[in-house]
Amino acid sequence: MLFALAVAAWGGRWGGATRAVASGTALAAAIIYYDVVHKRDPLSPLIMGLCRLLIYVTAALVVSGRIATPVLAGAAALLAYLIGLTYVAKQENLARFRNAWPLLFLAVPFLYAMPIVTDTVGGGLLYLGFLGWVVYSLSFLRPQRMNIPGAVVRLLAGICLLDALLLAGANEPMLAVAAIGGFILTRILQGYVAGT
């Protein structure tokens, strides 16, 4: 994907080539850094969120040559979600879940997306579906049901629902439907490929 974005940017098809390539390079560096040191780095939840944020930024730069405020705001909401999710993932090898306060980061997308609920019926349904999915995912962290990997894979699939919600808020219903398809496909593939 990074190669395709870089080729499109360098080809000048969409503009913003230099910034898009710089953003793509930063994305590649963040991914490599995360892969190499995420187990040892206490800031790895931030780095993982930064990787996803840079996907939004790079795509925006390739397509339009600029980063609009809604892209940054949506990327920031996604960053917060990824910080919360990655914190949960870092607890995977512990006997019990500690320090629940980082889970508050998972609430940020819901605060940001609140106006989407009132804009359209579809946006409201997506909001409620995403909320229900996150609550269900977090239920795997209860002491009597403790299954941290189960929570993590569900929260990972939930990224697609957040994407769908943000796309609905951007008045892109067909792309929102595609993101919901991504959620379904992710859950199916998680039956074959370990998500953690």
Stretches found by the model and what they are:
Residues 41-43:
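Short, non-helical or kinked segments that cap or interrupt transmembrane helices
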Residues 2-5, 14-16, 36-38, 50-196:
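C-terminal membrane-associated helical module and adjoining short loops/tails
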Residues 6-8, 19, 23, 32-33, ...:
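Multi-pass alpha-helical transmembrane bundle typical of ion/small-solute transporters
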Residues 46:
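Charged catalytic and DNA/RNA-contacting regions of genome-maintenance
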